Amino acid sequence: MSRAPLPLAAHERLIFALDVPSHDEAIAWVDRLGDSVAFYKIGMELLASGEYFHVLDALAKRDKRVFVDLKFFDIPATVAGTIRRLAQWPVSYCTVHGWHAGMLQAAADANHGAMRLLAVTVLTSMGRPDLAAMGIDREPVDVVVERALAAEAAGIDGVIASGQEAGPIRRATGPAFSIVCPGIRPGGPVADDQQRIVGVAQAFTDGADAIVVGRPIRLAADPAAAAAAIQAEILAAVGQDRS
């Protein structure tokens, strides 16, 4: 059974995707954004830099929440061992692929409540043609909800999924199940590699607990102001005390 969603203040519901190649660039972004962002996602690009855990430690020392987005996908024993080691670090969220029930169960058993584990369902860069090319001739929403239910049954705490599926996931799963949505585009659709996108208010109206935003902040003329504007939208959508 999944646990209650991670208690989040309104300003912690914006997660900035720290998709940069080095420790120095990562910390420069944290300093640039200041109090406008309290939660950071660190992924594979920083892992390849060799400085991943230096960044994680630096974020923790700045009292920032950390989302480890490495999408673990391996045999159950390997994933379980990785989760046990990662649980020693100050991590709030961590992703595992949601396509193998035995692996999900092993991850949940190894976690012992240290982090909130999120199952990756269908990447927001994928649409129905991409699923069909993998031999899955179904709508993304149907696959996402199926994966969310399997993750919940395995004891995983939530999913990372497009805001387009937040409503169906919320209706299908229990109130303790966390929904974190990437592919958020505050200014509306743009020409990039994300396909299944929504706006800030819509994601929270449909049941998201937190959103991941990268390029709309990173490419803004004033990134801190862009983050602050998103924070204002979140506060209007969820209020100060929703958890």
Swiss-Prot record:
The keyword Lyase applies. Substrate binds at residues 19, 41, 69-78, 124, 185, 194, 214-215. It comes from the Bacteria. It is an enzyme of class 4 (lyase). The keyword Acetylation does not apply. InterPro entries: Aldolase_TIM, OMPdecase, OMPdecase_AS, OMPdecase_bac, OMPdeCOase_dom, RibuloseP-bd_barrel. GO terms for biological process: 'de novo' pyrimidine nucleobase biosynthetic process; 'de novo' UMP biosynthetic process. Keywords: Decarboxylase, Lyase, Pyrimidine biosynthesis. Signal peptide: none annotated. GO terms for cellular component: cytosol. It catalyses: orotidine 5'-phosphate + H(+) = UMP + CO2. The active site is at K71 (proton donor). Gene3D superfamilies: Aldolase class I (3.20.20.70). Pathway: Pyrimidine metabolism; UMP biosynthesis via de novo pathway; UMP from orotate: step 2/2. Its EC number is 4.1.1.23. Belongs to the OMP decarboxylase family. Type 1 subfamily. This is Orotidine 5'-phosphate decarboxylase. It comes from Xanthomonas oryzae pv. oryzae (strain KACC10331 / KXO85). The gene is pyrF.
